[in-house]
C-alpha cells in the first residue's frame, strides 16, 4: 500500500527525538575527491551534497532537532549548512546545530564515532530528548525515520539498528549482524575479514546502515561506560554494539524499505570513486531507484541563484546539445556534445568537444576539441583545448587517478592548476 506523505505531520515521538549526524569522516577511499573536503560535503546529483540526504530525511520525517558533528576539513560542509539549512524555525524549537570537534572533555579530537557523541554529551543532555537518533552523514538514501522510531518503541528496544542486505563481496566495508526470527540482534562484527552469508541468501549478508535509535538514558550510560574502557577505539560498531550485546540488552534490527512502500530501499555508501561515479550516472535513467523528482519526499539543499542552462550554436559542424543527461543551472554548452553525463552548476563546455559517461562537478571549464569519456572532473578544473581523457588509460594513469573499473578522476592539482576554489 502506497503511503501518502503529503499529509505528514510531526508526531510527539519525532518531537521527543534529537538527531545526531556524524559528519566528520574523511572518506579516504574517495581518493582526491576528499583531499579538500569531508566526505559528507562531496557534491552529488547535480546540485546536492551528500549531507543533504540525512538532513532532508530528518526534516521530512518530522525530526526537526538536528546536530551535525564535524571534524575533518569541515569548512565547505559548514558553509553549505549555514547557507542552505537556515530555514528551521527556532521559535518552534527547530534547529540544525553544528558541533565541531573542540576538545570539550579532553585534549584530543574525536577518537571515534562514539567518542564524538560522548564529547558533546552535555549539549545532547541540554536538549532533554527521550530518544537519540544517530546517523552517518555520508550515505545517500531516502528513509522515514518516524517508522524506525515507532518500531523501536513498539519492540521495547534499548537500541535499534537500521539494516539492509548487501552483496557478500562488499560486506567487508560494513558492520555485519546476525538476527533471530524476531529480528533481535544476536551477533555484530564491524568490517569482518570473512563475512558470512545470511541464512537463505548465499551471496548476501545483513549489514548495518550506520543508523541507530537509542533510548537517551541508555545511550548516556553506555557512552560513559565506554569512555573509561581500556583499549577501546570508542566506536559504535567496534565497541558500543558488541558491548551491549555481551550484556544481553535488547538490540533490534530494523529492515530498511523504500519510503513509498515495502520494497527494499535505495541506499548507497558511495565510499569509492567507482561507487560515486555509478551513483551519479544512475540518476540519469528513465526510472532511477533514487527519484530526485519526488515531490512527497524532497531533498532540500542550498539553492544558488543561477540562470538556466544554455545550449548555443546549431551549425552543421558544431551544435550545442545534450542527450540522456542531466545539466544544471548556470551551464553553457557552446557547440559541444554531451552524452549520458551529469553536469553540476556553472560548467562551460566549448565547441567541438565531446563529453560522454562523465560526472562534471561545479565550476569546471572545458576547452575546445576535447574528448572526455568515463571521467569525474572535480570542482574548479580548467581543461585545456585538445585534452583527451578516458581513451588511453595507461596514459591517463601517468597524470590522473584511474580506478579498477576504468573511471578517470581529475582534479585541478593534477592539471597543474593552483587551488582556487573552496570545495
From Swiss-Prot:
Keyword Transmembrane appears in the UniProt entry: no
One Pfam assignment: Hexapep_GlmU
UniProt-annotated binding residues for alpha-D-glucose 1-phosphate: 110, 175, 190-191, 208
One Gene Ontology molecular-function label: glucose-1-phosphate adenylyltransferase activity
Pathway: Glycan biosynthesis; glycogen biosynthesis
GO terms (BP aspect): glycogen biosynthetic process
Summary of subunit composition and partner proteins: Homotetramer.
Annotated family: Belongs to the bacterial/plant glucose-1-phosphate adenylyltransferase family.
NCBIfam families, per the entry: glgC, PRK00725.1, PRK00844.1
UniProt function note: Involved in the biosynthesis of ADP-glucose, a building block required for the elongation reactions to produce glycogen. Catalyzes the reaction between ATP and alpha-D-glucose 1-phosphate (G1P) to produce pyrophosphate and ADP-Glc.
Protein name as it appears in the record: Glucose-1-phosphate adenylyltransferase
Source organism: Nitrosococcus oceani (strain ATCC 19707 / BCRC 17464 / JCM 30415 / NCIMB 11848 / C-107)
Gene, per the UniProt record: glgC
Amino acid at each position: 500500500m502506497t503511503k501518502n506523505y503529503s499529509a505528514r505531520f510531526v508526531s510527539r515521538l519525532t518531537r521527543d527525538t534529537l538527531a545526531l549526524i556524524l559528519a566528520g569522516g574523511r572518506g579516504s577511499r574517495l581518493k582526491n575527491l576528499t583531499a579538500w573536503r569531508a566526505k559528507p560535503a562531496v557534491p552529488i546529483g547535480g546540485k546536492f551534497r551528500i549531507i543533504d540526504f540525512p538532513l532532508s530525511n530528518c526534516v521530512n520525517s518530522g525530526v526537526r532537532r538536528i546536530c551535525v558533528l564535524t571534524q575533518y576539513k569541515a569548512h565547505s560542509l559548514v558553509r553549505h549548512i549555514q547557507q542552505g539549512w537556515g530555514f528551521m524555525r527556532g521559535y518552534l524549537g527547530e534547529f540544525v546545530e553544528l558541533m565541531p570537534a573542540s576538545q570539550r572533555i579532553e585534549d584530543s579530537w574525536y577518537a571515534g564515532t562514539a567518542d564524538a557523541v560522548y564529547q558533546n554529551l552535555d549539549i545532547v543532555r541540554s536538549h532533554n530528548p527521550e530518544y537519540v537518533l544517530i546517523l552517518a552523514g555520508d550515505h545517500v538514501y531516502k528513509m522515514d525515520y518516524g517508522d524506525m522510531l515507532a518500531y523501536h518503541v513498539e519492540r521495547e528496544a534499548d537500541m535499534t539498528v537500521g539494516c539492509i542486505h548487501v552483496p557478500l563481496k562488499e560486506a567487508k566495508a560494513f558492520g555485519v549482524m546476525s538476527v533471530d526470527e524476531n529480528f533481535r540482534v544476536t551477533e555484530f562484527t564491524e568490517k569482518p575479514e570473512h563475512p558470512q552469508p545470511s541464512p537463505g541468501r548465499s551471496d548476501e549478508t545483513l549489514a548495518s546502515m550506520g543508523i541507530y535509535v537509542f533510548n537517551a538514558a541508555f545511550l548516556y550510560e553506555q557512552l560513559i561506560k565506554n569512555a573509561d574502557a581500556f583499549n577501546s577505539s570508542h566506536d559504535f560498531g567496534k565497541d558500543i554494539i558488541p558491548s551491549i550485546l555481551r550484556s544481553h540488552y535488547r538490540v533490534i534490527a530494523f529492515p530498511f524499505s523504500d519510503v513509498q512502500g515495502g520494497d527494499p530501499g535505495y541506499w548507497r555508501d558511495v565510499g569509492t570513486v567507482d561507487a560515486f561515479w555509478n551513483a551519479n550516472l544512475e540518476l540519469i535513467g528513465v526510472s532511477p531507484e533514487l527519484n530526485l523528482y519526488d515531490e512527497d519526499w524532497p531533498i532540500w539543499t542550498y539553492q544558488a541563484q543561477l540562470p538556466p542552462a544554455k545550449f548555443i550554436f546549431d551549425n552543421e559542424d558544431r551544435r550545442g546539445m545534450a542527450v540522456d543527461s542531466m545539466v544544471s543551472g548556470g551551464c553553457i554548452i557552446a557547440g559541444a556534445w554531451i552524452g549520458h553525463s551529469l553536469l553540476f552548476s556553472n560548467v562551460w563546455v566549448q565547441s567541438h568537444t565531446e563529453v560522454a559517461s562523465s560526472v562534471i562537478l561545479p565550476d569546471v571549464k572545458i576547452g575546445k576539441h576535447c574528448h572526455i569519456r568515463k571521467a569525474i572532473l572535480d570542482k574548479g578544473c580548467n581543461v585545456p583545448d585538445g585534452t583527451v581523457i578516458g581513451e588511453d588509460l595507461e596514459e591517463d594513469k601517468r597524470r590522473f587517478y584511474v580506478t579498477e573499473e576504468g573511471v578517470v578522476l581529475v582534479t585541478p592539482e593534477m592539471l597543474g592548476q593552483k587551488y582556487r576554489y573552496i570545495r
